[in-house]
């Protein structure tokens, strides 16, 4: 064999192997200039859920939305046929997002915040028109755009996407969004109230009661929370009694199945509850019919 020549790797190969800038990787859409200013706070005071008014400020209400990527957007062609919760920046851990964005220039953060505000306003208008699918898509894209350092902005976006999902009966997804909103802003009463309502609708009464209590601790004037705190304890007690009866009924059926080969039934065993301790005792009765 001849002598080996010095091999040079083509520069084109290096070009093809360049690592994408983390800042570019997280941008799912091309930059869009922010030509619109944010709506005034007074224009957003109307919440379609008729939630009690709270401290609005940066946390002003968004309007309910629903999830879809059917609406075509520049650069979104790869997302259209995927579930919106699959690998979206809006679903990533906030601390992880913040780590990715730590070297992002302030000007870029400002631009992205303005763009997310534009998408938010777009979602608001879509929601008010009843276009919940399109509105949720706008909120999701706003979350993908909004830098994680603006936690209150992202909290509002999560809360309003939850409202949109409520409109489409996507209750579990809406609960998840509310929880993210509360994590980012623990004093965000609107998000807590929305999650409490969702817990009620999914028969998670204990969790709902805890949220309503949390609301009253932060703002005793919220009538809906006060009314729920008076109503839910009785509902929880009735539910627990119903579950206990169902459990005892199933145990009785199982007991009869096991005892039948021995000529016995659960009627041979009397269960008595101690009123002072609430505990139960079981007594064997040879001829239960004679004791009636």
Swiss-Prot record:
The keyword Phosphoprotein applies. Keywords: Phosphoprotein, Repeat, TPR repeat. One of its GO terms (cellular component) is cytosol. SUPFAM superfamilies: TPR-like. TPR repeats lie at residues 116-149, 155-188, 189-222. Residues 36-49, 75-85, 99-125 have a biased composition (Basic and acidic residues). Transmembrane segments: none annotated. InterPro entries: TPR-like_helical_dom_sf, TPR_domain_protein, TPR_rpt. The keyword Phosphoprotein applies. Residues 20-125 are annotated as: Disordered. Residues 86-98 have a biased composition (Acidic residues). Interacts with the GAP domain of NF1. Interacts (via TPR repeats) with HSP90AA1 and HSPA8. This is Tetratricopeptide repeat protein 1.
């Amino acid at each position: 064999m001849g002598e080996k020549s010095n091999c040079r790797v083509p520069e084109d190969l290096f070009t093809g192997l360049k690592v994408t800038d983390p800042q570019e990787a997280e941008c799912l859409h091309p930059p869009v200039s922010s030509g619109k200013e944010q709506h005034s706070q007074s224009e957003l005071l109307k919440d379609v859920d008729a939630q009690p008014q709270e401290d609005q400020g940066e946390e002003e209400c968004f309007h309910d939305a629903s999830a879809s990527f059917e609406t075509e957007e520049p650069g979104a062609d790869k997302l259209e046929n995927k579930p919106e919760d699959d690998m979206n920046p809006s679903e990533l851990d906030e601390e992880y997002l913040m780590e990715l964005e730590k070297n992002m220039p302030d000007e870029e953060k400002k631009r992205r915040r303005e763009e997310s505000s534009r998408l938010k306003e777009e979602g608001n208008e879509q929601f008010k028109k009843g276009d919940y699918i399109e509105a949720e898509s706008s909120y999701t894209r706003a979350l993908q755009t909004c830098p994680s350092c603006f936690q209150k902005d992202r909290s509002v976006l999560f809360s309003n996407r939850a409202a949109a999902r409520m409109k489409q009966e996507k209750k579990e997804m809406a609960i998840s969004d509310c929880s993210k909103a509360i994590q980012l802003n623990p004093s965000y009463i609107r998000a807590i109230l929305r999650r409490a309502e969702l817990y009620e609708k999914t028969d998670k009464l204990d969790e709902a009661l805890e949220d309503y209590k949390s609301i009253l601790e932060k703002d005793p004037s919220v009538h809906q929370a006060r009314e729920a705190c008076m109503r839910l304890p009785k509902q929880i007690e009735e539910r627990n009694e119903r579950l206990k009866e169902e459990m005892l009924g199933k145990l009785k059926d199982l007991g009869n199945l096991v005892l039948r080969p021995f000529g016995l039934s659960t009627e041979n065993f009397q269960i008595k509850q101690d009123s002072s301790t609430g505990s139960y005792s079981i007594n064997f009765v040879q001829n239960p019919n004679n004791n009636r």
